[in-house]
Amino acid sequence: MSKKHYADRNLKFETLQLHVGQEQADPVTDARAVPIYLTSSYVFHNCQHAADRFGLKDAGNIYGRLTNPTEDIFEQRIAALEGGVAALAVGSGAAALTYAFQAIAHAGDHIVAAKNIYGGTYNLLAHTLPDYGIEATFVDPFNYEEIEAAIKDNTKAIEIETLGNPNSEVVDIEKIAGIAHKHGIPLIVDNTFATPYLVRPIEHGADIVVHSATKFIGGHGTTIGGVIIDSGKFDWTQSSKWPWLVEPNVSYHGVSFAKDCAPAAFATYIRAILLRDTGATISPVHAFIFLQGLETLSLRVERHVENALKVVKYLENQPQVEKVNHPSISKDPEQQALYKKYFPNGGGSIFTFEIKGGAEKAQEFIDNLELFSLLANVADVKSLAIHPASTTHSECNEAELLDQGIKPNTIRLSIGTENIDDIIEDLAEAFKAIE
């Protein structure tokens, strides 16, 4: 019997997160670990070789702002884990979202976005991108008639998050993808809170997936980065909405990204144009750290979820708690069904609860936590807590906060991987301190 080739094996997630991009030892040094390539630029073999690289005829390295071998392995690996054809790593999650929007919409265009998204993304769409002529309409992601009614002739995409921020509502990716595709526009999904280990949005109809790699991918609160994954499934030539992707690009000798770079047209356009010209480049050191994070992603996420579900049960029975916002205990039949469909192995280690007593009591509770750290990050192996109304969503007015499900007494928790008894004891001590 002939030996089955490595690339032909149906490898599982836990194996892919360790091997994709470097299936064999480094060909130059025989190192098994991915090397960190700290170089600003790359030597061309001759002038023709250089010209071919710059003309996109040869897909090799040109300059460190655009590509790097360490980054390339990270991009290959996260693309494989998400089920995409290509990925682009950038300097932050905010940069990933900004590039995704700027590659899909220009001045005079429009984006429909769920209103239960990260405060920074809300601010980008509501206040920053309008300065560049890109408008946004925020919708209830569970009101499908409202979503469809918000789509206009100049709408270029719908954007949602797999799990809402900060209350972890589960959205129906397939349903919203169907609405987007009915109108000939792509669906962008921020999968930061779920990770591809729990949910792979592309399998449910998403066209573009983005992550703040700072969160679960890195996992240890050490490194800033973001990533865009191109599903390769959206047909950019189906209409005249994206001429910059379809028509010959004068800055690349007439290359048509949709025709010459398919199926990875979207990711290639961002790298070749936006990254080239605005340079939100990820450091190869950061890419290396994210690769190390991916190697333990499944193990960490399992523990995060296990601990979170136990904390949810504890908070449900805590008399000082008014309400716990977590899909696993939702009384809404739609949420129950969506959680079962998209999160069969559980999910939502970042969630909120409402404490009795208002904003002052919420802040007093947080100030009495010791094991939990008060900081703006989430998805660290260490447990974290924050008061969203005065921090992550502070740019929103009172009406906007309530519209996003954030009250003055809302506390967001990001449950880490510590021993669950220690996590619950810390919460119990904080409740006791504010009695």
Model-derived features: where do they sit?
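N-terminal "arm"/small-domain region of PLP-dependent enzymes with the aminotransferase-like
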Residues: 2-68, 76-77, 411
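Conserved PLP-enzyme active-site core in the AAT-like
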Residues: 2-9, 21-25, 87-317, 325
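Short, acidic Gly/Pro/Ser/Thr-rich loop/turn segments
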Residues: 25, 43-47, 235-236, 297, ...
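Conserved N-terminal alpha-helix of the aminotransferase class I/II PLP-enzyme fold
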Residues: 46-98, 120-128
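Short amphipathic alpha-helical segments
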Residues: 59, 85, 286, 290, ...
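Conserved C-terminal alpha-helix-loop-beta "cap" of PLP-dependent enzymes
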Residues: 301, 309, 315-411, 415
